[in-house]
């Protein structure tokens, strides 16, 4: 009996050990996801504060200054206010479409962050088709906007949803062609491989210098995909009140607000990854690999800092553009996409393909 009791205790201890391992495994699965979401939320809060401060500087006025030091908690105050507001629904609208639309817009953009590499070893999903995954997922967001506009049973909302879909289709194609040119130069569709391909020649190895035309087209198309001025036709206040957001209030309206800045941040990160060398420091005689060999935590921190510094440089350009240029008309927007950017991006892809074939 004593031997039997000992065996039972041993088996129970092993079972507890295995269950603890499973629990720890589950915890370590969610830790990177939670860290990424926390970083994204912090990045969005910083972008909102930067936009308020930069717009105040451009317009020569004082920005937010009461919510926290230098107004840094203004975005948190706005989010809290929207959280406690009543969620109104149109009486004759399509309630399922009206409710699901904002969630689809936010979730599709959040999933795109999984393929962003912040360093050589810090990427949530290092996939062989990472770039195509981003393009495929980002094309789902306009469907959510169209659902929101249609479900609102409002002519202004429906027109805003149609404009969002038309604008996305018009600028998604030039953007995809620019990405294909980059993948041809890097011989890969993985975001990590694209960054490493730019690290061979330092600063002059960036795709910015090898694809200047593609960089400009990607820049314009990214702003159009984010629906930022001068491309904010889906929510033009003078024409459509607030576009597809007209009937929304409370937290659902806040989701559109968050989705806009999430889209801007992901576009800035992809500009950094595809054209600005990603996490590479690009300073002579300083190698990221040497930093990793000395101290992996220090090297990863430096890589994250470099990536974010390049990202916020593009964000500054986007914010300054919003408060500088006037809004385009709808016909000008579509003509720019179909008659100007699409032929140039297609020619750039054919030229890149020719150079790659002759260099074999």
From Swiss-Prot:
Role this protein plays: NDH shuttles electrons from NAD(P)H:plastoquinone, via FMN and iron-sulfur (Fe-S) centers, to quinones in the photosynthetic chain and possibly in a chloroplast respiratory chain. The immediate electron acceptor for the enzyme in this species is believed to be plastoquinone. Couples the redox reaction to proton translocation, and thus conserves the redox energy in a proton gradient.
PROSITE patterns membership: COMPLEX1_ND1_1, COMPLEX1_ND1_2
Pfam families, per the entry: NADHdh
Principal subcellular localisation of the protein: plastid
UniProt organism field: Olimarabidopsis pumila
InterPro entries in alphabetical order: NADH_UbQ_OxRdtase_su1/FPO, NADH_UbQ_OxRdtase_su1_CS
GO molecular function, one term: quinone binding
Endpoints of the signal sequence: none
Topology of the protein relative to the lipid bilayer: Multi-pass membrane protein
Catalytic reaction list: a plastoquinone + NADH + (n+1) H(+)(in) = a plastoquinol + NAD(+) + n H(+)(out); a plastoquinone + NADPH + (n+1) H(+)(in) = a plastoquinol + NADP(+) + n H(+)(out)
Listed NCBIfam families: PRK06076.1-2
Protein's GO biological process: aerobic respiration; photosynthesis, light reaction
Protein name: NAD(P)H-quinone oxidoreductase subunit 1, chloroplastic
Entries under PANTHER family matching the protein: NADH DEHYDROGENASE SUBUNIT 1, NADH-UBIQUINONE OXIDOREDUCTASE CHAIN 1
Keyword Phosphoprotein attached: no
């Amino acid at each position: 009996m004593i031997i039997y009791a000992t065996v039972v205790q041993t088996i129970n201890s092993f079972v507890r050990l295995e269950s603890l391992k499973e629990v720890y495994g589950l915890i370590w699965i969610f830790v990177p996801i939670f860290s990424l979401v926390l970083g994204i939320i912090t990045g969005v809060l910083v972008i909102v504060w930067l936009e308020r401060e930069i717009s105040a500087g451009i317009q020569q006025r004082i920005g937010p200054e009461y919510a926290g030091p230098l107004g840094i908690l203004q975005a948190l105050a706005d989010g809290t206010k929207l959280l406690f507001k009543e969620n109104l629904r149109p009486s004759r609208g399509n309630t399922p479409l009206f409710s699901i639309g904002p969630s689809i817009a936010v979730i599709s953009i959040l999933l795109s962050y999984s393929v962003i590499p912040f360093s050589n070893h810090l990427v949530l999903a290092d996939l062989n088709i990472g770039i195509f995954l981003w393009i495929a997922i980002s094309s789902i967001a306009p469907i959510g906007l169209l659902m929101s506009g249609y479900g609102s049973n409002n002519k202004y909302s429906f027109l805003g949803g149609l404009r969002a879909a038309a604008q996305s289709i018009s600028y998604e194609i030039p953007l995809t062609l620019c990405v294909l040119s980059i993948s041809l130069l890097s011989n890969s569709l993985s975001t990590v491989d694209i960054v490493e391909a730019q690290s061979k020649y330092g600063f002059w190895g960036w795709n910015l210098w090898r694809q200047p035309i593609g960089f400009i087209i990607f820049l314009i198309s990214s702003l159009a995909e984010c629906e930022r001025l001068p491309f904010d036709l889906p929510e033009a206040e003078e024409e459509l009140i607030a576009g597809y957001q007209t009937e929304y209030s409370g937290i659902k309206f806040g989701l559109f607000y968050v989705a806009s800045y999430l889209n801007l941040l992901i576009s800035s990160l992809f500009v950094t990854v595809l054209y600005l060398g990603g996490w590479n420091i690009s300073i002579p005689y300083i190698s990221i690999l040497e930093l990793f060999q000395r101290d992996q935590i220090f090297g990863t921190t430096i890589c994250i800092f470099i990536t974010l510094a390049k990202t916020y440089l593009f964000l500054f350009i986007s914010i300054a553009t919003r408060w500088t240029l006037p809004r385009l008309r709808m016909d000008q927007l579509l003509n720019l996409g179909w008659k100007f950017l699409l032929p140039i991006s297609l020619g750039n892809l054919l030229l890149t393909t020719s150079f790659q074939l002759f260099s074999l």
